[in-house]
C-alpha cells in the first residue's frame, strides 16, 4: 500500500480516502489471486490502522489553527475553496455544495446521499442502528456489528443493515422512532437469531469480494465472548462521553457585554430552551462531527451548517455598518433628532449583543464536543484494532475462500433499496402481460400471412419454369436462323476485303520504288526529330528558370508593397506633426488666458495692500496716542500726528503697483507678438507638409501606373503561351487525320458489333420470364411494407422516449415542490415554536394540505403515465424485432431466386459468345493490315511540313519576347530612380523644418530668460506661469524633434530599400542576358517566347486613418492632452469627471437647477488648487458664505456624461461585483429632504472591508425645500444585481421582516441592490406602509398595516424580475411567507433561470 501521508486539511483528507480505498481494492485483488494466511492478516491489520489514523486526523484538522477555528470562519466561498482545492468565482453556495456532493458520491461508490438533509437523515439512522442493536440482536454480537456499521456508513460505504425490532432510545431518555432499514438479501427472515448478525458479517466482507462459508461462521461464534466484552467497553465509553459532554455544557459562563440600559441579560445553556435542544445530546453532535462535515461542508456552529453559521456573522457585520451610518447621521451636538432613529440605534445595539452571546455559546459548545468526541473515537478505534486482531485468527478459513468479483456486483445490486418501486413494477408487470398476449396474437397472424406468401411464391416459381422451357426452344430456333444469315454476310464481306487487299498490294509495290528515293529525306526527318527533342528539353529547362524568375518578381512586388506602406507611414507622420503644431497653438492661447487671470489676481492684491496700509496707519496712530496718554479727541485738538507719512506710503504703493501693471502689460504684449510669429511659422510649415503630401500622392500614382503596365505585359505573355499551346494542338490534329481512314474501316466492324449486341439484348429479354418478374415484384412490395412498418415502429419508440424524458422532468419538478413544502412545514413549526397564533398555524396547515394533495395527485398521474410508457416501449421493441426477422428471411429467399436466374443466363451467353469470337479474330487481322499500310503512306510529308512551320514561328516569338522583357526591366529601374529622388527631396525639406524648429526653440528660450519678475510680492505667481510655459514649449519641441528623427530614419530606410531593389534588378537583367546568350550559342536562335514576371494584384495605398504612427502596429497612438493643466474646463464652468467630492455632499447636498444657476452672477469661477471647480474669487466673506452654505444646504456637483456612460457600460466583475446604488432620501422616494447638520459619510460595506472593488455610487438629485412634492412624479432608479449581492442576501438571517425588506429596498443603499430595475411611481410613501403591484400579472402584494383607502397613493409598481428576487428572499427565510396572500405562484418554480441577469433594465 505504500506510506500514507498525513493530510493537513480537509481537501487532502478527502483525496487520501479516495486514493487509499483504491489501494485497498488493489490489495484485495492481489489477495484473491494468491490467498494466504499472511496476506489476509496483513490486509486487515493495515485496514484497522488506517481507520484509526483517519479518525484522529479528521479531529486534529478540526482543532488545528491551519484549518481555521470553526467559530471564526466567516467566508463561505473560502470554506468551499478549501474543500474543493480550486478557486470558486461567483457561483452560488448551494450549487457548489451540490456539485461537491456529486463528486463524493462518485468517489465512495453507491452512496445515495444527494443533499445535506439526506446526510442528516442517514446519520440519524446510523445513530439509531448503533443504539438499538443491543435490544434488537441476540447477545453483544449485534452491538459490536452495529458499531462497525456506524464506522462503515461514516466512510460512505452505504452498508445496508437488517431491520431492528422495538423502539430504540438514546442515553438521555428521549425516545427515537424505530428505523426501518432494507434487509440484506441473504435471507435474514429465517434461521437462528444469529443469522442477521452473520448476514452483516457477510455484507461487510462482501464489499471486498469475499464470502463467508460455514467454517468461518463457526470460528466467529467461538470468539463471541471476547467481542461481547469489547462491545460493553464501547457502551461504557459512550455513556462516559455523554456525561462528560453534559458536564462540560454545565460549565459554560456567558460573556459580560455592557449595555446602555442593561435590558439584555446573558443566559447559559439550558436544556429546556428550544434553541439549544439540538445540542443536549452527544448523538446529534456526533452526527455533526461525522464525515458529513467533510462532504457537506458543515462546521460545528449554532446550527451545524454553513448557512446558519455565516448568517450570524454577516448579520453582525451588517448591523455594525448600519450603526455606523446612523451615528454618522446624528447631529454635531450628539442629540438624536427623531424617535425612529433612537429606536433603530437601540435595536441595532441589542441585536449586536445577542449575536455576541450566540457566537460565544456556539464556540463553547463546539470546543466541548471536540474534546469529548476525541476520547470516544480513541476507544472506538481500540475496539476496531481488537476486531482486526481477532480476525487474524480466521485466516485458516479465509485461505480457503474463492473470492469473485461477480459476487461483488451481485451484492452491490442487492444492497440498493427497491421497496419504493415494487408497487410500480407490479403494475408494470400486469400491463406487460396484457401487451404480451396481444403481441402473441399479432405474431400468429403474421405467421399465417407469411405462410400464404410462401405458397404463392412456390406456385409462381412452378409456372415460371414451364414458360421458360417453351421460350428457350423458340429462342434457339430463331437464333439458328439469324446465325446462318450472319455467316453468309460475313463470307461476302471477307471476299470484298480480299479483293481490296490485292489492289492495295499493287499500290504498295509502286510506293516502294518511291520510298527508295525518299531515303535521304527520311534521314533528314530523323535528324529534325532529334533536334526537336533537344529543343523541347531546353524549353523545359528555360521554363524552370522562368518559374524562378517569376518567384523573384513576386519578391520584388512584395518589396514594392512594403515601400508603399512606408510612404503611407510618412504621410501619417506628417499629419501627426501638423496636429502637434495646432495643439501647441492652443496651449499658447491658454497661456494668454492664464495671464489674464493673473491680472485679476494683481488687482486683488492691490486692494489687499490698500487695506493693510490703512490698518497699519490706524495701529500706529493708536500706539502713538497710547504713548502720549491721550485720547483721539485731544490729539485732534492739539494738531494730531504728522500727516506727511501717509501720502508718502500711498505714493510708494501706487508707484509699485503701476510698475507691476506695466511689467505685466509688456509681458502680455510680448506673448501676443510671439503668438503671431508662431502662427505664421505654423502656416508655413503646413504649406510644406501639403507640398510633401502632393509629391507623395504623385509617387503613388506613378507606382500605380507601373503596376498597370506590368499587368499589360503579363496579358501579352499569356497570349503568347496560348499561341504556343495552339501549335501543339496542330500536331495533335495531324496525328488524328492519319487515323481517319482507320476509323472508316472500323465502322463496318462497329455495325457488326451492334448486330451482336442486339442479339444479346434479345437473349436477355427472353431469358427473363414475366412470371419471375411478377414474383420478384411481389416480394419487393412485401419487403417495402415491412421496412415502412419498421420505420413507424422506430418513430413510435422515439415518441415514447420523449414521453419518458418528460415524465422524468415532471418528476424532478414535483420533487422540488415537495422540498419546498418541507421547508414550509419547518418554517410553520418555527412559527409555532416562536409563539405564533393558533389561527395563523391553522391557515398555514390548510394551505399546505391543499398543496400536498395537488402534488400527490400529480405524482400518482405521473407514475401511471410512466407505467404505460414503459409497457408500450417493451411491446414496440418486441414487435420491431419480429418484423426485422421476417424481413431478413424474405430478403434471403429473393436473393436465392435471383442468383439461380443469373447462373442460367450466364450459361446461355457463353454459348453465343463462341461464334462471335471467331468473326472478331478474322476482322482483327484485316484491321491490322489496313493500319500498317495507311500509316506508312500518310506520315512522312505531313510531319515535314509541320516541323518547318513550327520552327519558323518559335524563332519569331523568341525575338519579340526578349525585346519586351528588356524594355520592362529598364522601365522598372527608371521608376525606382524617380522614387529615390522624391524621397531624397522629402528628407531635405524635413531637415529644413527641423532647423527652423530649433531656431524657434532658441528664440523662445531667450524670450523666457528676459522675462523675469522683479517684484517680491508677485514673484511666486510669475514664476509659476514661467515654469508652466517652459514645460509646454520644451515638451512640444522635444516631440517635434523625436518625430523628425523618426521621419528621417524612415526616409533613410526607404532610400536604402530603393537602392537594394535597383541592384537586384540589375542582377536579374544580367542573369537574363547570360541565359539568352547561352540559348543562342547552343541552338543558334532566340527562345520561342517572352519571359515576363506575373501580374500582381493592385492594393490601394494606405490612407491617413488608423494604424500606429510610430510602429505601424495597427493601433493609433492617442495624443497627449494637457487640457487639465490649465483648468480650461473649470474656467468654462464644466466639471472634471470623477473629481467631485461625493462623500461631503451626499447627505445634505442639492443640485442647482437651470433657474437657480443664474441667480448668483457675481461669482467669477476660477480653478482651485486641485483642478476641480472652484466657487469664485473676490472677497473673503464670499468664501465664508460658501463654507456656511455647504454646511446647511450643500452644493452637489454634476457628473459629466462621459463618467455616466462609463459607469453604465462597465461590466461587473466576476467575483464581488460593485454595489452601485442610487441613494433615496430618508423619508422615502419623493419626500422632502430634511436638512442635516453635518455631511454624512457613506458607511463602509462588508465588501469594502474584504478588499472587493466597490464603485462610487451616483448621488441622487435633491428636490428644493420650497418646492411642493408632486403626488405622482415618476422617478427612475437604476440598480444592479450580482451573484455576490445575492449571496449576501441568502446569507442573511430570518430576523428581517417583510416590512424591513421593503423599507431597505427604498431607503437603504446596501440592501436596495436586491432588485434590478425598480420603477417607483408613488411620490410620497410613508414609512412602514407600502403596496407592491406586479405590472405583468396585475397581482398586488400588500404589507401589514396598509390602509385600503390610501393604497392608490402608496403603490409601488415592480417588474416581474423585482418581485422574483423578493420571493427568492422569502424562500430562503429572509421574510415570512404568510405576508404574501396571493396563491398563484406557479411561475416561482423557474426562478433559477433569472439569476444570471445583471445590469439595469431599460424599462
Swiss-Prot record:
It comes from the Viruses. Residues 620-632 have a biased composition (Basic and acidic residues). Residues 1154-1163, 1193-1212 have a biased composition (Acidic residues). Residues 1261-1275 have a biased composition (Basic residues). Residues 620-650, 1083-1116, 1142-1239, 1253-1275 are annotated as: Disordered. PANTHER family: CARD DOMAIN-CONTAINING PROTEIN (PTHR45615:SF66), MYOSIN HEAVY CHAIN, NON-MUSCLE (PTHR45615). This is Uncharacterized protein ORF22.
